[in-house]
Amino acid sequence: MSLLGRIAEKTSRLSCLRLMSVYPTHYVEPIVQKYKQLEQKNDLSKLYHVPIKAAVNKSSDTIFHDDTKHKMINYITKKGNSALARTLLSKTLELIKRTQTEHMNLAKGEKTTINTNPETLLKQAVENCRPLLQVTAIKRGGVTYQVPVPITTKRSYFLAMKWLLEAAREKERKVSLPEKLAWEILDAAHGQGRVIKRKDDLHRLCESNRAYAHYRWS
């Protein structure tokens, strides 16, 4: 991994902290899911006298809730039509399931290595598409430099899902969005495709401008 990549990885934990947070730093995150409470029941006694943050509105303890799917639905939604967005994502996951099941049935070797869980493949695709760095324009002495800076965890997930949707929307009129999005997710989950290339191009741009990294603090 490059030097800039290591710097971004070390600062990833600090990057997600808000400068104007409502809660002080000694407040701990709430445990909403009941199965996680059962897993950590031996450690709950340590939290009796520790202040805990309030759970966010979107939190849910149902086993069917998935943060990645929830965020993807929000990014797909247009003009407040979230029902259509949920339908499109459901069709996308169904196509991924059918495609992977077909590959597994046609495989002659070890079939257990083929992942047929569409939700797992969606998470893997988003993780593979997350950038570590981005460039920002900083002007020094009348010259504008493209300075590489670490990217926050929240924005890295946003860019990964945004790039997947942009790649899916660049399609022919005869191809539906769920079909094209399923292709992009499968490609990204296997470390290939246009979105992976876009992330690599951004990292190469950051690497080529690493000489200007000190302008971030000046």
Swiss-Prot record:
Gene3D superfamilies: Ribosomal protein S7 domain. The keyword Ribosomal protein applies. It is found in: Mitochondrion. One of its GO terms (molecular function) is structural constituent of ribosome. Keywords: Mitochondrion, Ribonucleoprotein, Ribosomal protein, Transit peptide. Belongs to the universal ribosomal protein uS7 family. This is Small ribosomal subunit protein uS7m.
